[in-house]
Design a protein with these regions (language model features):
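Extracellular glycan-modifying ectodomains
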Residues: 1-369
């Protein structure tokens, strides 16, 4: 007879043996895969800036991460990320919110004309839905439109051909273009355009709204794929805190709200759908035992060690060659940090960054006291 319902639970159910006493930066059994992801599966990656680390690690370990919008041959490799190439499976940049994801999918899979929301900048046209993919903007509106048409055909190809979508949930806060209803990856006025409250509104997506967006994404993509085999979804939550908040809350409170909502949405989806799995990169990096090592000095940028710690748990479940490689190898071959350097100035001004993250621009434009 048990004295307590906790008496015979496995060690992973208790904080002390499974977290506080964790050794060698490994937390055993924190992730048990729901389904196989093989190296022959076609993977589409998308999400907030942390998702770029995941895509880079998957490629390096031999997974088939599709890229249907590659850089032109004449563009030097060191310029690829300046133009949005090589970040994801197509040139859509960071998709920070669930609403951004479903709106892009609907646009790419529809037969209608592309949505054109643009800003003027020094005589050029900036695609407000992808403000960072052309550093100097487009010379004409027709050029912007043609690039967007081409881009959407690439996204459509990704959505129809993928076997697994790896999507990192990043933010709940976003800015909406009122006339079209489209949400933007970056607030107006940060890199181009200007903020006019009659044209744009701040939106903070709640639990129900995020959940509905993800369910709608499934319906839209499933309908377009027809008789193709059903795709699977691997969700993660970005451990990168918000750079700034447009809510009335303190940034720390706003960040906790945002990540809590997204984590809850991911859990609800994973618990209710056999085609959806959740990988706990958020928990692996934000856990208090390794917190000091997992972040750089700005308490926001994920360190090389932090990325490697998270991805080693993923690889141990999905890479059959991982044991022969060894766990220490994952640390040594981790993706570069979001921003190189060890102080705030270096982190803000690094030109060698391996990760493109538009949200960081919000801090650069603030009015200093």
């Amino acid at each position: 007879m048990r004295l307590s319902p906790y008496q015979n639970l496995r060690p992973e159910a208790f904080w002390r043996p499974s977290v506080a006493q964790a050794q060698a930066r490994q937390i055993p059994n924190i992730y048990q895969k729901k389904f196989e992801i093989s190296k022959t599966d076609r993977l589409m990656t998308a999400g907030s800036c942390f998702a770029q680390h995941i895509g880079a690690t998957l490629r390096r370990h031999g997974f088939q991460v599709i890229d249907h919008e590659p850089a032109p041959l004449e563009l030097p490799a060191w310029r690829h990320k300046d133009f949005g190439y090589g970040m994801y499976s197509a040139r859509y940049g960071n998709l920070y919110t669930t609403l951004q994801l479903v709106q892009l999918a609907k646009e790419a899979l529809s037969s209608g004309p592309p949505d054109l929301i643009f800003w003027k900048n020094n005589g050029c046209f900036v695609d407000a839905l992808r403000p960072q993919i052309e550093p100097h903007g487009f010379h004409s509106l027709s050029e912007l439109c043609e690039h967007r048409r081409r881009h959407l055909s690439c996204v459509r190809k990704c959505l129809l051909e993928m076997d697994v979508l790896v999507f990192t949930l990043g933010l709940t806060e976003t800015w909406q273009h009122l006339a079209s209803g489209r949400v933007l990856p970056l607030a107006p006025g940060v890199v181009a355009g200007h903020y006019d409250e009659s044209e744009y509104s701040f939106v903070n997506l709640r639990f129900r709204e995020n959940l509905q967006c993800m369910k709608k994404f499934f319906r839209v993509v499933d309908r377009a794929r027809g008789n193709r085999p059903p795709f699977k979804l691997l969700l993660t939550v970005s451990p990168v805190p918000l750079t700034a908040t447009a809510s009335s809350s303190h940034i720390l409170v706003a960040n906790t709200f945002s990540k809590s909502v997204l984590r809850s949405v991911a859990e609800e989806l994973a618990q209710s759908n056999d085609r959806i799995d959740y990988f706990p990169s958020y928990e692996l990096i934000t856990n208090p035992i390794f917190l000091a090592d997992n972040y750089e000095s700005n308490c926001r940028t994920i360190s090389e060690v932090g990325v490697a710690t998270a991805m080693s748990s993923f690889l141990s479940q999905h890479d059959p060659d991982y044991d022969s490689i060894g766990k220490d190898d994952a640390m040594l071959t981790a993706p570069l940090p979001l921003r190189s350097g060890k102080n705030f100035q270096d982190l803000d001004q690094s030109v060698d960054s391996a990760i493109a993250c538009e949200e960081e621009l919000l801090d650069r434009g603030r009015l200093l006291p």
